[in-house]
């Protein structure tokens, strides 16, 4: 199976400026992500950035970097530019890995690529079961429901499916585990251009979830339970401190 990993990395971050270059045990965060992705068996791992500081650091550790426009409105537009600049064939599988996940397991990068290769969908992603009831009601924990074949029916920040009877009886809503979506995607490269030429849908604007555009226009997204539950990404200084402690062991 052939696939390419693209890792978007932006310097600007509201809560943690310069996040991709944050030092973690002697290496910048983006290098940790790059090295994890490189263990997944991809043909190529590319870091996409619009910042010369990140470009210089990536070249310094021997990584493959593609400079992109600073004017993209979404990460998907950035992917399209990388696919075009790097000459990635339309039938190639591209896995988008977030640049703030230094602990991402290589196994799930390969898993989502293989799931796409084995499916009829133009796009695939992963989920994990929700074990904590607080996540059921947390709008930042995006829920997903699928059909019998593992294709997404809907993604929502609300609690879906809603167990009416369990709620009425005061029972735990995790008895029949909900699925929490995790932010890793695999695409057939040619589908990216199709996607960015669609107008944003009403549903994605309401939920603030880009992937709903795919379902709105009648395409499929394959969803599987991740073989390994990934650690949380780095959004804050507290997150960064936790990752440093883990990798220092």
UniProtKB/Swiss-Prot annotation:
Record keywords: Cytoplasm, Lipopolysaccharide biosynthesis, Nucleotidyltransferase, Transferase
Chief location category: cytoplasm
Transmembrane portions of the chain: none
Cleaved signal peptide residues: none
Pathway stated in the Swiss-Prot or TrEMBL entry: Nucleotide-sugar biosynthesis; CMP-3-deoxy-D-manno-octulosonate biosynthesis; CMP-3-deoxy-D-manno-octulosonate from 3-deoxy-D-manno-octulosonate and CTP: step 1/1; Bacterial outer membrane biogenesis; lipopolysaccharide biosynthesis
Domain of life: Bacteria
Family of this protein: Belongs to the KdsB family.
HAMAP family the record matches: KdsB
Function: Activates KDO (a required 8-carbon sugar) for incorporation into bacterial lipopolysaccharide in Gram-negative bacteria.
Protein name: 3-deoxy-manno-octulosonate cytidylyltransferase
Native organism taxonomy: Bacteria, Pseudomonadati, Pseudomonadota, Gammaproteobacteria, Vibrionales
